[in-house]
Amino acid sequence: MTFVRIGQFNALPGTTDALRRIYETEAIPVIRQAAGNVSALLLQQHQSPESFMAITIWKTQDDAEAYDRSGQAMEMVAKIKFAFAGPPTLGTYEAYGIPKAA
């Protein structure tokens, strides 16, 4: 079963451009290279531009947990935490309807 993590957070005013640039150029490439990663993306809400969702999709829960244990997840959070208006929330989900990853 495909495993999805969704991190939700709000950014401080004036930090959204830098946060988006760092996540897109530094975090996403690292996450996508991790074993078992299917996709990684960052969503920014139109109605509230300080509101973000970071979504990672994994072949298995074990793959996501191995990425966490590697320390890379915390390194990526450290690069963008300057922009957090408060603590992020993390939800985990089983995904249905996603084409089977190779």
Where do the language-model regions lie?
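An amphipathic, aromatic/His-enriched active-site/gating alpha helix that lines ligand/cofactor pockets
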Residues: I22-V38, I57-G91
